[in-house]
From Swiss-Prot:
It comes from Glandirana rugosa. Disulfide bonds join 27-33. One of its GO terms (biological process) is defense response to bacterium. The keyword Disulfide bond applies. InterPro entries: Antimicrobial_frog_2. Keywords: Amphibian defense peptide, Antibiotic, Antimicrobial, Disulfide bond, Secreted. It is found in: Secreted. GO terms for cellular component: extracellular region. Belongs to the frog skin active peptide (FSAP) family. Brevinin subfamily. This is Rugosin-A.
Length: 33
């Protein structure tokens, strides 16, 4: 239902945001950006 759709959407956004943060952090640590 709607709640499940919303939950999946929130999870995928959280995953995407987490990946972005990890990429930025490793980039800054490695000075590779």
């Amino acid at each position: 239902g709607l709640l499940n759709t919303f939950k999946d959407w929130a999870i995928s956004i959280a995953k995407g945001a987490g990946k972005g943060v990890l990429t930025t952090l490793s980039c800054k640590l490695d000075k590779s950006c």
